[in-house]
Amino acid sequence: MHPPAVSLTRFLRHSIAALLLTLAGNCGIVQAQQKTAPAQEKPKIRAITAFINLDRAQYQQQVADALKMLKRAQTVFESRGYEVQTIRISTQPFPEYTKGLTKEQAVEFFKQYDALAAKEKFAAAIGPAMLNAGDSEAQADLLAEILGNTKTLNASLVVAGEDGVHWAAVGAAARVMKKLEESTPHSQGNFSFSAIAMVPPLTPFYPGSYHTGFGHQFTIALESANVVAAAFKGAPDLSTAKQRLTDSLAASAFDIERLAGRVDQDTGWAYMGIDLSPAPLKDVSIGAAIENLTTQPFGTSGTLTAAATITAAIKDVKVKQAGYSGLMLPILEDSRLAQRWSEGRISIDALLSYSAVCGTGLDTVPLPGDITAEQLSLIIGDMASLAYKWHKPLSARLLPALGKGWGEMTEFDNSFLVNATLQPLDRK
């Protein structure tokens, strides 16, 4: 038996009206969420880093092959709206491919490699001078000569590994820092050098980047302090802030990983992961992002909790992670951090305490020029001990400024650095 036409018409009219009311209600919910949720920020790609097993007899062809992949990757990422800031090539530890050379011959080779990097517009890392405990300290002395005579090269010393702190390397790293302070313009050679502890191979960030395998691999580094700032702005509590940050980073990281997989398939270079550390750059400030959450100046109570929140959010992003993948606090690469350092709100001990819950240690920290190698080794040793104790990647990139004392302003002439007022080593 069929329902009367009038009843059917009334039924349809009521059903359509109910559907319209439901849609209108849902529309209101969506609009409300759009008002409360932070706008989606897109990170930049700080670096696409290729890893090669450098052979002096054919390094030019190896570099050409790596650049072909890097430029293909750059095109892929830029087509999706990601700004790629640098392309980079890192090698195995340089003592492995300079065996048999005199100091003068090694320096001359790296001058040629430096010129190639400048010509082809890629950043270059030549790996650690000392990788294992017991490695020759003469290689650290050679490294100081290499960095003092080149402009684009980056390198490191490993001062802690699975076997503990490498105390000879700690002292050697301090001597390299003093040599670079005294022998490079504006003492800027130390910007390209770091003492690294528990830092795994294949990190894309410089200067501690290296590998120990066959190469033909690549990783990606982000510049995403803007993503942190947007996620934290107006967050009502830590839990919300953390979830917002995880979701925001994941949205881009999944997309970047998918694109990296395409590069892997297209080129045959193996994609080894992404370093999600939210690197800042001057006014794109991680310090300001943290202040969005704490509503207090960086360095006051609550800063450590914010640092832990960022690191926890990063660890929850389910992509293939590489390198540090933790919070970076590079004092002179971040305008707000440089300001708070100048105000005396941040100290080396405070940075080490934050490193206990995040990373990456002591990065671009300005120091008075009269600091001794012994004092530098104590600072590096503290960082290395912390890294080994908690089995986490940390580094020390310390920037003593020749001829400058506490209370004076640094005069670094580098587009990546912000100058700041030097603070005393021991604050009372």
What are these model-derived regions, one by one?
Residues 15-26:
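Bacterial N-terminal signal peptides
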Residues 28-31:
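Sec/Tat signal peptide C-region and signal peptidase I cleavage site
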